[in-house]
Each structure stands twice: as structure tokens, then as C-alpha cells.
Amino acid sequence: MRITATVRTKNEEKNLRRFVESYQWADNVLIMDDFSDDETYLNEVVSEFENAQWKQFPGKRVAKEGITRAPHGNHINALFDWAEEIGTDWIIFDDCDCFPNKLFRSSAREIIEACKQDFIYLVRIYLYKDKGYFPYMSKPAGDWEASAYAFRANQGFRFSVDESLPYIQTFVRPDESYVLRLMPPYCLIHCPWPDDEAIAIKRDRYSRTYGERYSRFDPLNFAGELDNLEVWMD
């Protein structure tokens, strides 16, 4: 069985090596870049890890408010097309600032190979700088909430190309039996807010791309209270 991890990049110098290193149990790590300012880090990472390769997004890019980028849906779908073209049984898709915790990595291959469902969901743990994590982001209704992480290839799973709904998943799952939901201590570690600079960059990009409501973007305003990390959150 072949397992392929996929990720989009644009100026991800701080995150890419950690992402690829966390998927050394996968057969391939496919990186599709959106014209980073400097390609050096991409070449350095793929030269270090034999299962990694990268290429530029091949489609048409869009410009809005001074930001030129690959459309979300087209970029993601191009990654999925690439994975299926080279041949794979399972596709993992995640952000470059997210990675599976050590406990999941130690058994990930066996879990995926034994999975009878078409989708695997995992819980994301949202870290804030080095100060802890936001429990609310992982369990907004009180219980752990898992989201899409991996899916069986060649089933037609693709993202919407409607830019107003960039993350709508167009593959219809007939019922919950098609999903394997994994709960902590298996998890994904998400690091979207490592420092003030990263928060400011996100605030600027999101407000220009999605509107004024993001101009005051700060996780301390919407992500709930911070809590200390558990031992399995690494």
C-alpha cells in the first residue's frame, strides 16, 4: 500500500522541514509551491529527504488587493491529481504548519493500512506561541472534534473551485460509516501562531484577501482560553 502526504507552500521556510520530517513513514511527500520568493529552502528540503519532491503550481493564479496567489481549490486539486498520477492508495492533505504528533507517527502506517473506511479524521491541537494551546478550537461543543486528514485515492474527492467557498469538500460521503474518527492521544499539532510576526502576517493577508473583518485578527480574541500542553501533544 502506498501513502502520499501532500502540502501547499508559499514562503514556508520555517515550517517545511518539520512537516516533511514528520512524514518519513509515508512513501511520498508532494510539495506544490505557489512561487515562493526564494526556492532555496524547497531544494534543500527535498535534497535531504528522499521521499520528498516539489514543483510549482501549474495553473492560472489570481490577483486581489495586491496579493497574487494560486486559487485555493485549484491548488489543492492539482496536488491530489499529482498524487494519483504517480500512483497512491491514500492521500494525506494538511497545512505546512501542522504535523502529526509522535504517538500517531509511531502507528500511522499500521492504522492507515488496516483502515476499512474511505476517510480518516484527526483532532487538531492549536498551539499559541510557546504558551500552550486553545482547547476551544479543538472541542468547540465540549467534545473533541476531528476533521478530514486522509482519504482513499481515486474516489473523486476534490475541493470546490468556487473562491467564495474555498474549502467546501465536493465528494459526498453517503454516511458516517465511511469515516474513521481517531481521538486523542492521536492528534495533529497545528502551529498557526508561533510568534507576533506570524500573527501580523496572517492579519494582513487575511484582511486583504477576505475583507475588513480580519483587520483585528488575533487568536486571543476568538480562540478561547489558553491551557497547558498535555504530555502527548508533541
Which residues are covered by each model-predicted region?
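Cell-envelope/extracellular polymer assembly enzymes that use nucleotide-activated donors
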Residues: 2-4
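Short, well-formed alpha-helical segments that are part of the catalytic scaffolds
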Residues: 11-25, 31
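A short acidic, amphipathic alpha-helical/loop segment
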Residues: 18-22, 44, 106-110
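Short, well-ordered alpha-helix to beta-strand connector turns
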Residues: 26-27, 88, 96, 117
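Short beta-strand/loop segment that forms part of the nucleotide-sugar
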Residues: 27-36, 55-57
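Active-site acidic Asp-centered loop
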Residues: 34, 94-95
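Active-site-proximal specificity loops/subdomain of glycosyltransferases
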Residues: 38-93
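Catalytic-site signature of metal-activated, phosphate-bearing donor transferases
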Residues: 66-81, 99-234
